[in-house]
Amino acid sequence: MKIFIFYNPLKLSNDDLEENILKPFNESNIEVIGYAAAGSTVEEKQAQVADFFVIFGGDGTVLKIAEIAAIFSKPVIAVNTGNLGFLSSYSSSEIKELIEDIQKENISFSFRHLLECHVGTKKVVVLNDIVLLKSQPLGTMNVDVKIEEHTLFSFAGDGLIVSTPTGSTAYALSAGGPIIHPELNVVQLIPLAAHALNIRPFIAPPTQRIEIILKNMSKGFVYVTGDGDIIHRMEPGMSIFVTSSEMTIKLAQRNGNNYLNALDKKLGFGRRFE
């Protein structure tokens, strides 16, 4: 069994990496063929021969690895060394259990759908969301959203979230969107602070292309972000296109700990408040 390790250097020191992660794996029959900080360049040969990508960090670290995992079709096992760790199946204190589960093949995987954002000649692939945000705190942006040439939204507001089901428990949830089971293949659109009573979140099919047109701004310009990273600056009259990607990633879920368990344990979803 061969693994490649990605880690967040802000959450994991070199000493911790050597002593608490690399050493236990090296003492098992699991070969660590390489390791790298999330976001750094990885040799294609190493990525291809790995059986799994094992990620040490928070949810943001998982998001940084999503595209490369999809490109090389490598299952992802996430170990939380951050805060919430909603996408993680193991905590940093469960390295022994992780090694045993890998050895015994006691891990199942769920397929997570991705989004593609096309900006000019650039294509960006994300696991959570594409977001349009104002550069200035005051004022509004005027946006048209089209699905296959049909105008779905035309509104003034603070921005727009285009989310995957996996991203429905991230920014989209805070903005009033529904929780969508991650194994569904749909695209969610959530206007941010739309100045209209008739503008509400909308769930679109994955087969249709979404065009987002920035008509005008009262102040500043618009940032386009992909999983939290700025990928483009929009000026009035510009468009971007978002589609569901044909690529997916396989994200580990510990046997007995499915998505509904994670909602309960990490978000407190469905609990009655006494």
UniProtKB/Swiss-Prot annotation:
PANTHER family linked? NAD KINASE
Q: Where does NAD(+) bind?
A: D59, G60, K64, N128, D129, D158, T169, A170, Y171, A172, L173, S174, A193
Output the GO biological process annotations, alphabetical, semicolon-separated.
NAD metabolic process; NADP biosynthetic process
InterPro entries found in the cross-reference section: ATP-NAD_kinase_N, ATP-NAD_kinase_PpnK-typ_C, NAD/diacylglycerol_kinase_sf, NADK
Gene name of the encoded protein: nadK
| Listed GO CC annotations | cytoplasm
Main EC class the enzyme belongs to: transferase
Q: Which family does it belong to?
A: Belongs to the NAD kinase family.
Q: Please list the residues that make up the active site.
A: D59
Per its record, how is this protein called by name? NAD kinase
Q: What are the record keywords, sorted?
A: ATP-binding, Cytoplasm, Kinase, NAD, NADP, Nucleotide-binding, Transferase
Keyword Cytoplasm listed? The answer is yes
Question: What EC number(s) does its UniProt record assign?
Answer: 2.7.1.23
Functional summary from the UniProt entry = Involved in the regulation of the intracellular balance of NAD and NADP, and is a key enzyme in the biosynthesis of NADP. Catalyzes specifically the phosphorylation on 2'-hydroxyl of the adenosine moiety of NAD to yield NADP.
First-listed, main subcellular location of the protein, grouped into a coarse class:
cytoplasm
